[in-house]
Design a protein with these regions (language model features):
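Conserved CoA-thioester-binding segment of acyl-CoA-metabolizing enzymes
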Residues: 1-64, 74-78
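Short, flexible, glycine/charge-rich loop motifs used to bind or transfer phosphoryl groups or to couple energy/partner
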Residues: 6-8, 44-47, 107, 112-116, ...
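Hydrophobic/aromatic residues within transmembrane alpha-helices
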Residues: 19, 56, 69, 138-139
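Glycine- (often His-adjacent) and acidic-residue-rich active-site loop
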Residues: 58-115, 131, 161
């Protein structure tokens, strides 16, 4: 398959594609590049009739994914300030109306979550270590989630002063119920 920088893909003989997040030095922190690479890997898997299922896991034992890579500070959530990326077009149309289909209105975790949800192959999350923020929410649209004995999950959005992302406010209550989802998120 394709040569990636933030993930590795391994197609097993039994038709299982393993996608491994490969940034263990930063606890597999999620970046825009990782989102694009995961979407490309999912697209290729869906197009390959020999792939029967997809497993997503993280390299190393400390974390499946420790959340968004915040190493760029305020540039993390500002498309116009990101280095090495073209600024995304505005979501405001010439007449002042909002283009609600604009990708700029969707967080990167949400784009990935919807792509996982729309996968035509079963997607399994194999969690080893911490799954925090987008690391936890990317698991929600997966068909099966398997946790190792050292897996830990954190929905830390409210404690960070941000809203839950990656469609988690839609997926989480459907998995664990509204009461448990509210307790975990707030």
């Amino acid at each position: 398959m394709t040569d990636y920088q933030t993930i590795e893909t391994q197609k097993e003989d039994d038709g299982v594609l393993v996608i491994t997040l490969t940034r263990p030095d930063v606890m597999n922190a999620f970046s825009a590049r990782m989102m694009h690479e995961m979407i490309e890997a999912l697209d290729q898997a869906d197009a390959d009739d020999t792939v029967r299922a997809i497993i997503v896991t993280g390299a190393g034992e400390r974390a499946f994914c420790a959340g968004a890579d915040l190493s760029e500070g305020d540039k993390t959530f500002d498309y116009a300030k990101r280095q090495g990326e073209a600024a995304k077009p505005s979501a405001v149309n010439d007449d002042g109306s909002i283009n609600w289909d604009s990708e700029i209105l969707r967080d990167t975790g949400g784009i990935l979550a919807l792509r996982i949800f729309n996968s035509i192959k079963p997607v399994i999350g194999a969690v080893n270590g911490a799954a925090v923020g987008v690391g936890a929410t990317m698991l929600l649209p997966m068909d099966v989630r398997i946790a190792s004995d050292n897996a830990r999950f954190g929905f830390v959005f409210a404690r960070r002063g941000i809203v839950p992302e990656a469609c988690s406010s839609w997926f989480l209550p459907r998995i664990v119920g509204i009461s448990q989802a509210l307790q975990w998120c707030y």
